[in-house]
């Protein structure tokens, strides 16, 4: 048996208010249409649902049975409609993002602040991952998308879009101030202690290749887990390190560290968005992605 859900919806409100006129008012309809719909419902179900009187209606046993089943469904559907409406207008919702430390520090945090100011009802879940881990999280469907720093290896089915280029600088503690006036070579850096991220990181791979291309070998004396840790170690005079210029800027301006200069040009890196274009995003995630890619181009 097929019965139009609209009839059940009208039945729910008539039974709830025990009055055709009140139900019509709530539904934005008129009493004759409501009465006609309920007559059709009774005809299709082949039973009497209401006892009509001048004061309104009361439910028959069959009506009571139907209402006991319909009420919870009607409330859940109404809640779902309200939630979808709130989601569509960005009053509520959630976004899950995997981000690398560099991407979060020099790009994503500012975008998140602007988005959260405009849409405070959207919940944000940010996961801190390395670039390979972030890409894998997108592939596994664990996050809506990832914001990473290059280099990155992207598998088939995923798309990568450049959001912002950035460059890195070589910095050292104040004991290396005398070197700041020189133009060093990568080979000469072998004479000084170096601080780097772990051997498994894409940043380490990036600099390993950079050194090799100039007939030099990258041999760090100290490994750190994060760029923030590297900066702390640099300030503690443990060695030299390559760090994103935006992350070193404040410390350089305060004179806590010094910038050293290389003869070789450090290749530019990029902050990129990675997403699965086969997987649809919810309204909030789609809106934030549009904000990020307003002036993008492929990496």
Regions picked out by a protein language model, each given a short descriptive name:
Residues 130-135, 139-142, 149, 208-259:
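Hydrophobic hinge/microswitch elements
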Residues 157-195:
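Flexible hinge/capping segments at coil-to-helix
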Residues 42-61:
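A short LG(V/I)-centered, amphipathic sequence patch enriched
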Residues 193-214, 281-285, 289, 299:
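Secondary-structure junction motif
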Residues 44-45, 66-88:
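Alpha-helical linker/hinge and terminal dimerization helices associated
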Residues 92-154, 224:
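Central regulatory/effector-binding core of bacterial HTH transcription factors
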Residues 14-30:
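Short helix-boundary/capping micro-motifs
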Residues 107, 258-299:
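A late-sequence structural motif
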């Amino acid at each position: 048996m097929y019965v139009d859900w609209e009839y059940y919806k009208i039945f729910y409100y008539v039974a709830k208010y025990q009055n055709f006129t009140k139900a019509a008012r709530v539904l934005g309809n008129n009493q004759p249409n409501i009465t006609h719909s309920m007559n059709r419902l009774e005809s299709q179900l082949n039973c009497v649902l209401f006892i009509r009187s001048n004061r309104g209606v009361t439910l028959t046993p069959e009506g009571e049975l139907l209402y006991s089943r319909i009420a919870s469904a009607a409330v859940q559907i109404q809640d779902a409609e309200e939630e979808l409406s709130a989601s569509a207008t960005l009053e509520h919702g959630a976004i899950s993002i995997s981000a690398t430390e560099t991407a979060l520090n020099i790009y994503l945090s500012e975008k998140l602040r602007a988005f959260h100011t405009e849409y405070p009802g959207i919940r944000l879940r940010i996961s801190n991952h390395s670039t390979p881990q972030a890409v894998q999280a997108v592939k596994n469907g664990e996050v809506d998308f990832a914001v990473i720093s290059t280099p990155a290896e992207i598998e088939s089915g995923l798309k990568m879009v450049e959001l912002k280029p950035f460059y890195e600088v070589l910095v050292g503690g104040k004991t290396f101030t005398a070197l700041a006036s020189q133009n060093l070579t990568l080979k000469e850096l072998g004479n000084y202690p170096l601080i780097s991220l772990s051997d498994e990181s894409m940043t380490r791979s990036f600099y390993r290749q950079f050194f090799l291309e100039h007939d030099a070998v990258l041999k760090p004396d100290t490994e750190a887990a994060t760029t923030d840790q590297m900066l702390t170690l640099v300030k503690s005079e443990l060695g030299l390190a390559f760090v994103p210029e935006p992350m070193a800027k404040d410390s350089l301006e305060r004179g806590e560290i010094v910038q050293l200069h290389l003869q070789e040009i450090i290749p530019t890196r990029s902050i990129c968005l990675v997403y699965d274009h086969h997987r649809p995003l919810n309204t909030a995630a789609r809106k934030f992605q549009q904000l990020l890619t307003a002036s993008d181009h492929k990496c």
